[in-house]
């Protein structure tokens, strides 16, 4: 069995790490490189960086910090933000990123997933899915351009359908960003994760809602996700990654202990 992964997420805007609640009202957390270094030293398995306004601004991720991160950490990291072409992806990978993640650009042009996978291999192509639960309809819908609340829109895709579509097109991994849970720290949406897990045959990463060590355990044990991504609990030092991994190991979770 592959070890489960603990993945800190760093949302980047204007060269700094920020964090919002339900993708809104972002506050500045700190500088990118020192945070990345700290998480690597604490025992993170990999890092994910989202340039959250790149797609909505119509630009690609700011590449200047990518190479600086690569210089100070020795764990894999993934970069997302406005990657709309093979050239965009090639540049980011050449600066040291191990994976690239696409979200809104994939919704605008689903063939991008296949072209990236064919060029760089499925192992480094991640598709991020921003999913919102509609309490009135009881359905999960995919959202686009979520980095800018003035441009965020609900797409025609239901989440389970889009999960299956991106796999057909070559996604090597899926990060499910559960917007309702984002930043509120009351647990991952286990019901949604279980439904997605049934149709997801590539590595699945849970994102949105972690507030306690037990929340990570529930995602691994009850929804069988491959990785758990979190931001605010790590940024605010509510949970230490090393202590989290030690706890998970005592609960029988296969995890890499540093």
UniProtKB/Swiss-Prot annotation:
UniProt xrefs under InterPro entries: Aldolase_TIM, His_biosynth, HisF, IGPS_HisA/HisF, RibuloseP-bd_barrel
Chief location category: cytoplasm
Active-site residues annotated for this sequence: 11, 130
Organism superkingdom: Bacteria
Reaction(s) catalysed (UniProt annotation): 5-[(5-phospho-1-deoxy-D-ribulos-1-ylimino)methylamino]-1-(5-phospho-beta-D-ribosyl)imidazole-4-carboxamide + L-glutamine = D-erythro-1-(imidazol-4-yl)glycerol 3-phosphate + 5-amino-1-(5-phospho-beta-D-ribosyl)imidazole-4-carboxamide + L-glutamate + H(+)
Biological process terms in GO annotation: L-histidine biosynthetic process
A single cellular component GO annotation: cytoplasm
EC number assigned by the record: 4.3.2.10
SS bonds (residue pairs): none
Pathway: Amino-acid biosynthesis; L-histidine biosynthesis; L-histidine from 5-phospho-alpha-D-ribose 1-diphosphate: step 5/9
A GO MF label: lyase activity
Key words, A-Z: Amino-acid biosynthesis, Cytoplasm, Histidine biosynthesis, Lyase
Compartments, as annotated in UniProt: Cytoplasm
Alphabetized HAMAP family for the sequence: HisF
Family classification: Belongs to the HisA/HisF family.
Description of how the protein assembles with itself and partners: Heterodimer of HisH and HisF.
Role noted for this protein: IGPS catalyzes the conversion of PRFAR and glutamine to IGP, AICAR and glutamate. The HisF subunit catalyzes the cyclization activity that produces IGP and AICAR from PRFAR using the ammonia provided by the HisH subunit.
Protein's recorded name: Imidazole glycerol phosphate synthase subunit HisF
Protein species of origin: Shigella boydii serotype 18 (strain CDC 3083-94 / BS512)
Lineage, top ranks: Bacteria, Pseudomonadati, Pseudomonadota, Gammaproteobacteria, Enterobacterales
């Amino acid at each position: 069995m592959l070890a489960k992964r603990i993945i800190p997420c760093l949302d980047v805007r204007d060269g700094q790490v920020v964090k919002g609640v339900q993708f809104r009202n972002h506050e500045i957390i700190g500088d990118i490189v020192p945070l990345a270094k700290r998480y690597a030293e604490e025992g993170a398995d990999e890092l994910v960086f989202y340039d959250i306004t790149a797609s909505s601004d119509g630009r690609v991720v700011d590449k200047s910090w990518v190479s600086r991160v690569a210089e100070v950490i020795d764990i894999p990291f993934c970069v997302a933000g406005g990657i709309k072409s093979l050239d965009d992806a090639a540049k980011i990978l050449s600066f040291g990123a191990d994976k690239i993640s696409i979200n809104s650009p994939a919704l605008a042009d689903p063939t991008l997933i296949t072209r990236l996978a064919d060029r760089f291999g499925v192992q480094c192509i991640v598709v991020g899915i921003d999913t919102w639960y509609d309490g009135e309809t009881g359905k999960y819908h995919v959202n686009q351009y979520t980095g800018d609340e003035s441009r965020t829109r609900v797409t025609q895709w239901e989440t389970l359908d889009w999960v299956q579509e991106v796999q057909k097109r070559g996604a090597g991994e899926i990060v499910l960003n559960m917007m309702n849970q984002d930043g509120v720290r009351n647990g991952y949406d286990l019901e949604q994760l279980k439904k997605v897990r049934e149709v997801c045959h590539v590595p699945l990463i849970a994102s949105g809602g972690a507030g306690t060590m037990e929340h990570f355990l529930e995602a691994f044990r009850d929804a069988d996700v491959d990785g758990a991504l979190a931001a605010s609990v790590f940024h605010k030092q509510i949970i230490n990654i090393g202590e989290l991994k030690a706890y998970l190991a005592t609960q029988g979770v296969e995890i890499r202990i540093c």
